[in-house]
């Protein structure tokens, strides 16, 4: 088990960080698939250790407080149909739920697109007091292709050159936040042919 995930199995100590590992990266970088394959290698993942999709929790919370909002049909609509003020309020309640479900692996965006601009909220990860971050990144052309072929999602189109900038900002932001908060950090380069190699880095 890598140092990033090993802390999830240890008994909590007074004053220690929460037993949370955030797996992050821009949309379409392969986080979901990597996590699903990683979970198959350890029966405790999904049972003793929760696997939480922050965006899905956020979407569910919005449906609870505003069930008549037809503009938001999935988590992909959160970044274009919900104001930043509403998102901020909902995020705080979702963070409380995530903390309550630790130890957990959290699939989340540290830097995310909100109505056409990249948003970063270090207060959220500071409140979560995570053990470590795992940043999943990939080739921009490959990300664009994965997004195109993922018919179950409704992502906004993004050219490869924009993906380069978005991915670099997200990567460096996550690295800096981890350093400032004293959390662990690991970057994983994701390709179609190295899933087993990446899983071995996390085990």
Enumerate the predicted regions with their spans:
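Small-molecule kinase domains that catalyze NTP-dependent phosphoryl transfer to phosphate-bearing small molecules
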Residues: 149-197
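ATP-dependent NMP and nucleoside kinases share a basic, alpha-helical "lid"
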Residues: 108-151
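ATP-dependent small-molecule kinase phosphotransfer cores
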Residues: 50-118
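P-loop (Walker A) phosphate-binding loop of NTP-binding proteins
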Residues: 26
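Hydrophobic anchor at the beta1->P-loop junction of P-loop NTPases
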Residues: 23
């Amino acid at each position: 088990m890598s140092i990033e995930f090993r802390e999830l199995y240890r008994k909590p100590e007074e004053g220690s960080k929460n037993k949370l590992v955030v797996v992050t990266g821009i949309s379409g970088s392969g986080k979901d698939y990597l996590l699903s394959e990683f979970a198959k290698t350890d029966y405790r993942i999904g049972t003793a250790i929760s696997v939480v999709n922050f965006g899905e929790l956020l979407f569910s919370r919005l449906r609870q407080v505003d069930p008549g909002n037809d503009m938001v049909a999935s988590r992909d609509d959160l970044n274009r149909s919900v104001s930043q003020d509403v998102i901020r309020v909902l995020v705080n309640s979702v963070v409380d739920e995530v903390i309550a479900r630790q130890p957990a692996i959290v699939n989340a965006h540290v830097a995310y697109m909100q109505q056409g601009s990249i948003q970063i909220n270090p207060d959220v990860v500071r409140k979560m007091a995570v053990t470590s971050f795992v940043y999943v990144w990939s080739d921009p052309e490959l990300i664009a292709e994965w997004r195109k072929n993922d018919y179950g999602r409704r992502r906004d189109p993004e050219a490869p050159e924009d993906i380069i900038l978005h991915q670099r900002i997200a990567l460096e932001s996550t690295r800096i936040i981890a350093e400032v908060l004293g959390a662990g950090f690991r970057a994983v380069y994701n390709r179609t042919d190295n899933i087993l190699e990446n899983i071995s880095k996390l085990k």
